[in-house]
A protein has these predicted regions:
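Amphipathic terminal alpha-helices
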Residues: 120-125, 129, 133-151
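Conserved C-terminal active-site "lid" loop/helix of NAD(P)H-dependent oxidoreductases
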Residues: 26, 61, 86-128
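Residues that recognize and position ribonucleotide moieties
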Residues: 22, 52, 75, 108, ...
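Residue-level signal for the nucleotide or nucleotide-sugar donor/cofactor binding architecture
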Residues: 21-27, 54, 117, 132
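A conserved catalytic-core signature of glycosyltransferases
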Residues: 18-19, 49, 105, 112
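NAD(P)-dependent short-chain dehydrogenase/reductase
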Residues: 1-31, 35, 63-64
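A short C-terminal helix-loop "cap" of Rossmann-like NAD(P)-dependent dehydrogenase/epimerase domains
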Residues: 3-14, 69, 98-101, 120
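Mid/C-terminal beta-alpha module of Rossmann-like enzyme folds, strongest
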Residues: 36-102, 135, 139-140
Length: 151
C-alpha cells in the first residue's frame, strides 16, 4: 500500500512525534522459523528484526529510492485523522462484506510511537542472525512487486 502510494507521488505519514520502528524481512522470518524448530524452547516467544531501529521516514525514503526517486509530496496528518479514516474503512468493510486495510487494528499499530524489538535473546538462544537489513529487503520487495505487475 505504501509503495503504491509513493509510486503515485504521495507519502502519507501519521503523527508529529518521532516514531521508532524495527523491521524484519520475510526470508529472515523463515530462517527464524527453522532455527526455532531446531533450537527453540517450547512455549518461548522470540522477537525478530534486522537488528536496527529506524524512523518511519527511513522506510518511505528507501521505497522512494527503490522506485527511482519519483517526485513526491510528503503529507503528515495528526493521529485523529487516521482514526476517522480507519473508522470509515471499517464502515465500508462492514457494508460491503470486504476487508479493509485501514481498520481499527491498523489504527492501533500506526498510532504507536515505539516498535523496538530486542533480538538479543533470539540471537543467543537460536543462533539467529538477520541477513537482510531494511534497505536490502525494500529493494528486493520493490523488484518483486514490479516483476509481478503490482507496481
Amino acid at each position: 500500500m505504501m509503495a503504491k502510494s509513493i509510486s503515485n507521488h504521495i507519502d502519507f505519514a501519521v503523527g508529529f512525534q518521532r516514531q521508532d520502528i524495527t523491521f524484519v524481512y520475510v526470508k529472515d522470518v523463515v530462517q527464524a522459523i527453522f532455527l526455532t524448530l531446531d533450537h527453540g524452547m517450547n512455549g518461548r516467544k522470540y522477537f525478530l528484526s534486522d537488528g536496527n531501529v529506524y524512523r518511519s521516514s527511513d522506510f518511505s525514503n528507501l521505497i522512494r529510492k527503490a522506485l527511482g526517486n519519483p517526485w513526491w509530496i510528503r503529507i503528515t496528518a495528526p493521529v485523529w485523522v487516521l482514526r476517522i479514516v480507519t473508522s470509515i474503512g471499517e464502515l465500508v468493510a462492514r457494508s460491503t462484506g470486504r476487508i479493509s486495510a485501514l481498520n481499527h487494528d491498523k489504527f492501533n499499530i500506526l498510532r504507536q510511537r515505539n516498535w523496538r524489538c530486542d533480538i538479543e535473546p533470539t540471537m543467543d538462544e537460536l543462533g539467529y542472525h538477520p541477513h537482510y537489513d531494511l534497505a536490502r529487503g525494500v529493494a528486493e520487495t520493490i523488484d518483486w512487486y514490479k516483476n509481478e505487475g503490482w507496481l
